[in-house]
Amino acid sequence: MTGAPARAAASPGADEEAASQARLTAEFEALLAEGETVEPRDWMPDGYRRMLIRQIAQHAHSEIIGMQPEGAWLSRAPSLHRKSVLLAKVQDEAGHGLYLYSAAETLGVDRAELLAALHRGQQRYAATFNHPALTWADTGAVAWLTDGAAVINQAPLCHTSYGPYARAMRRVCQEEAFHVRQGYDLMKALCEGTPAQKAMAQDAVDRWWLPAVALMFGPPDTEAAGGDAKTAALGAAVSRRAIAWGIKRHTNDELRQRFVDHCVPQAERLGLTLPDPGIRWNEERGHYDFGPVDWELYRGALGDDTHTARQRLAHRVAAHEDGAWVREAAAAYAARQSGADTAGTSTEAVA
C-alpha cells in the first residue's frame, strides 16, 4: 500500500485566491505608504480590522468605565460651580464612548456585541480606572493627569489611518484638552488654598501619578524602559505592527516620555512633588529622566481581579440592565418610523 502524498496539489482556485489577496495587500500597503485614509468600504486585511476593533473597543470601554471614579463625587462636590463642571465632564466621557462605538461599528461589529464582551470580562478597559477616587482632590488629579495622558496618547490618533476613528478622535481630543485644563484649575485652587487642601492635592497626585504613567500608555517597548523581557517583547511587537499600519504613530515609550516632559513643569508651577525620585532633567537627551515602573506591582494592584475592578464592572452591568427599557423604547420608535417611511414611499410610488 503506497503512502498518501505529503501535500495535496493546490487547486487553481486557491492559487487565484492567494494571488488576489497578495494584490489587495500590496495595494493596501501602497495606500498607507502614500498617507491615504482607509474608509469602511475599502478592502483591508483581517489583521488590520481585528486590531482596530480591539483598540477602538478598549478605548470606548475605557471612556464608559472611566466615568465612575469621578461620577461618584457628583453628589459631594463642594459648590454648584464645581458640580456643574464635573457633571459636564462626566457627560463628555459618555459621549466619547458613543463616538467610538459608532466608529467600531463601521468595521462590521455591533456595539451590543462589544458591550456583551466587556460585561463577560472578555474585553478590557484601561486598568487606570480600577484605582479608587478617595477624596475630592482625586477628581482634579484624574482630569489633570489621566486625561492629560489621554490627550498625549490620543492626539496622534487624529491622524490614524482609519478615517472614522481619526474623525471621532478629533472631537474627543478637543474635549479631553478642556478636561485637562479643568483638572489643572482645580489642582491650582487646592494648592492656593489652606495647607490641608494643598496636602489633599499632594496626596491625590501621589496616588494617581504612577497609574497614569504606567497604565495609560500600555506596556513598555524595551527592557530599558522598565519592562521584563516578555512584557517588552509584547509591547514592541504590537507597536511595530500598529505603526506599520498607521494605526499608531508613536511607540508607547515615546508617548510616556512626552507625558513626563509635559507634566513636570506643571507640577513645579503648582508646587507639587511628583512621587518619583528618579525625575531629573537630562541635558544630553533633552528630556526628563524618570524611574522604572514596577509592572508586576501594578498588574496585581490594578488588575481585573481586584475588588475595585469587580465593583466597576458590576456597576456597569447594572447600569446597562437598568437602561434596557430606554434602548427598547428607542428601537421600537425607530422601527415605527422606518415602517411609516416605507409606507409613505410605497404610496408615492403607487400615486
What annotation goes with each model-predicted range?
Residues 1-44, 48, 321-351:
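Extreme N-terminal leader/anchor segments
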Residues 42-48, 66-88, 149-165:
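Helix-loop segments that flank and shape redox-cofactor active sites
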Residues 48-59, 77-96, 139, 164-176:
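Alpha-helical scaffold segments that form or flank carboxylate-/histidine-based iron centers
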Residues 129-182:
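Internal, conserved structured core segments that host functional sites
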Residues 199-351:
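Extended, helix-rich structural scaffolds rather than catalytic motifs
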Residues 160-211:
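Glycine- and acidic-residue-rich phosphate-binding/metal-coordinating active-site segment common to enzymes
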Residues 37-57, 117-143, 160, 193-197, ...:
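Acidic/His metal-coordination segments adjacent to aromatic residues that form catalytic metal sites
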Residues 13-25, 89-117, 183-187:
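Conserved alpha-helical segments that form or flank metal/cofactor-binding pockets of metalloenzymes
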